Amino acid sequence: MKKKLSKKYSFKEVEANKLLFWQENNLFKAQINSTKKPFTIVLPPPNVTGHLHIGHAYDFTLSDILMRYKKLKGYDSFIIPGTDHAGIATQTKFEKNLKVNAQTNRFNLGRELFLEKLKIWKDEQINYIHKQWNALGLGLDYSNYLFTLDPIVVQTVREVFVKMFNEHIIYRDKKLVNWDIQLKTAISNIEVIHKEVEQKLYYIKYLSQDQKDFVVVATSRPETMFGDKYLVINPKDKRYFHLHNKIFINPINNIEMTVILDDYIDIEFGTGVMKCTPAHDFNDYELAKKHNLEIINIMNADGTLNEKCGEFKGLDRLEARSLIIDKLQKNNHLLKVESYRTSVGFSERTNEIVEPYLSHQWFIKMDSLIKDTIKMQDDCNNKVDFYPNRFNKTLLTWLKNTEDWCISRQLWWGHQIPVWYHKKTNQIYCDTIPPKDLENWIQDEDVLDTWFSSGMWPLLTTKWNYNSHFFDRYFPTSLIVTGMDILFFWVSRMMNFSQYLVEKKPFKDVLIHGLIRDSQGRKMSKSLGNGIDPFDIIDKYGLDAMRLFFASCTTIGEDLNFSTERLGANWNYLNKIWNIAKYIENLDEINDNLNFEDVDKFCDVNKWILTELSKLTLEINKNMDKYNLVVATKYLYDFIWNTFASYYLEYTKVLLQDLTLKNETIKTIRYVFNKILIMLQPFAPNISEEIWLCLNQTNNSILLQEYPIINFEFETIIIDKIAKIILEIRKLRLEENINNRINLCFELISPNDAFYKSKIKLVNLLLILVNAEINEIKKTSSNNYTYELVIDDFILKTSYEKPIDYVFQMKKASEQLNYLENEIQRATNLLNNSGFINKAPAQLIIKEKNKLINLKKEHANLLKTLTDLKQKVK
């Protein structure tokens, strides 16, 4: 039975089962033994915490568009999907679920049972993510799916850790780190959210030991005073230089404090004197290392003050703050308090204020890794290409200022560090397998930062250490699409690991996109309530409309503002394409396809559309190869909506009436539209597939077609001129209210009259569309004409005299009458307004009175004209 397109475009019908159709035909799997050139995209692995947000949809859709494009271009093109165990995010969410649903916590369960339950929950989450991927219509190679805690990944991560440990790249040390007091773990910079908050600035008086001098220090964190043994001044500050090396007394615990010099201190900021708290401030920590200062930790892992804080021991640091201020005030050391706004770091997961905290952690020495990555980027033949290119410079700037990477986390969920400590000797054992006498050893309880395993993602997904055939074919991968917000945390890590482990770049290209913001340009957040669910968009506008929105609004490297108007416009665009397809479906069937040998004999209109199609394919290929989707979609939109639909298909309505042109025209229409569908496929795969299958009466997917590169080039200037003639005649009819039923006859005046005479048959054929014709062509003309249309190198003249349209004139007179009545009422109200009469300048009042007189005269004259017109109509 012949397949038919439904009468109306319904995205729900069109998009149903398309992904299943492609999957059943194995269109998204790697072709390991193919001779095709590979094009591999590694999907950024979403966290296994559940619901995919619009940022995920954006990221994944761009990857899918480019995968489909390359597949149509003849590549072995596929996407490798995966999910990330996401240590902190997953453990935090699961612990909340435990608390709500089971009224317990991980400590009650113990590590083994907790992880067992979490793995079951993780499997449910991954199944949900797979369903969401399918709902997004993504063509993923599930046969190569990977999870960052799969056994092969665990083994690989251990091997890499051991290698780096043995080469002294990984080391353990006590350093200052970002600390979440609720989770009791170190966290990365990306997990710190900075918010502007109002805080108090306390001005505290410090007396010298000999009672002869005092200084004032401003601090927002008086609770950290228990860790202070130094005051710091700028050596260029003449106010305080004489105090260098002098001893002052800490007013909270009476400990001696020494004044030291450092040009880090800003003379103009605050009082110019700074207290130094190395264990609880990153800048102070650097000062301590520089001057070899004592570092005193005054805080426990849960944010309470420790034994160094005397009577305040055991209190939360924020609770203790007010009590400490009370004590300072009673002792006359608090001089004043000011409010000010400042940026404070909060934990993304718990919303707790992040504390700089001194603790034993594992670190990676970054200097050698960074040098190798920078060297790679300096090699034009081996570097990773960034789109846009400015992000290469951004990345290199970051790398040059990178400190050693803290890779340990005080969690249970993740890659447990493969290090054991001897119970008696504290000897360290590091290997991929536990020590033989395991009963004498204790394994390090910490797990690795999620970015450690994610940093090896291109290596892991291409089976680096266990399938050389797959790895050699697909590594380096071709492309990764990601947001600028994780350029340093993820992209740079992948470059570091690949260069270190295999001395190759991990991918050839990186496409960087910005954030999706709301319609007002604001970042989406829970507090603003402006988040957008991609599945709500799909339900309302359809998957293809959303894909077109992402593609047509994506200027690489820039943020994207969400717009329901653009989504609605995309639906209209798809509906237009559907209606075009319906028009083509109803054309007479022509058995033979377009024969290129016959094209030279085609009429100029069909040659023109083939030439325009050739130009289109050139532009789209060029821009798609540069990942410039916004330009590619614009070219395609303009061609479909304007060139093809508004002009060419309109022309074909008269061409199809000519039996000598009918067959070639139907062939051309179908040929051009099929090429349009192939170019549309990456952006709107569902509608293009549905139309392709129906119009071509085939079971073979459009994805098996060849992406068009067409080289028709005909001289078709006459078609451009005809288009201008039609446009000008339509404007003339509209402006002069000339009925479309009236045939307009023109003379064409041009020095190039021979050219136009040679094309007159075609010109008049197409002018049927506007009920007009050219009945004479001359070089010059001296006759008088009613209308003249000046177009390019010719003039169209007609002596048509329009009959007086009394009804039209009545309509215009009535509209003007209404306008005058409104103006008269406005002027009358103004002159009756005592406020205006009393306050306005006399000159302005006179002007308004004269205006009212003239309005009334004009109204009276127009009323008489309207009465006369009504009589004539009768």
UniProtKB/Swiss-Prot annotation:
E.C. no: 6.1.1.9
Catalytic class of the enzyme: ligase
Stored Pfam families: Anticodon_1 (PF08264), tRNA-synt_1 (PF00133), Val_tRNA-synt_C (PF10458)
Binding-site residues for ATP, renumbered to this chain: 526
Keyword vocabulary terms for this entry: Aminoacyl-tRNA synthetase, ATP-binding, Coiled coil, Cytoplasm, Ligase, Nucleotide-binding, Protein biosynthesis
Reaction catalysed by this enzyme: tRNA(Val) + L-valine + ATP = L-valyl-tRNA(Val) + AMP + diphosphate
Entry function: Catalyzes the attachment of valine to tRNA(Val). As ValRS can inadvertently accommodate and process structurally similar amino acids such as threonine, to avoid such errors, it has a 'posttransfer' editing activity that hydrolyzes mischarged Thr-tRNA(Val) in a tRNA-dependent manner.
Xref: PANTHER family: VALINE--TRNA LIGASE, CHLOROPLASTIC_MITOCHONDRIAL 2, VALYL-TRNA SYNTHETASES
Family: Belongs to the class-I aminoacyl-tRNA synthetase family. ValS type 1 subfamily.
Designated name of the protein: Valine--tRNA ligase
Species in which this protein is naturally found: Ureaplasma parvum serovar 3 (strain ATCC 700970)
Phylogenetic placement of the source organism: Bacteria, Bacillati, Mycoplasmatota, Mycoplasmoidales, Mycoplasmoidaceae
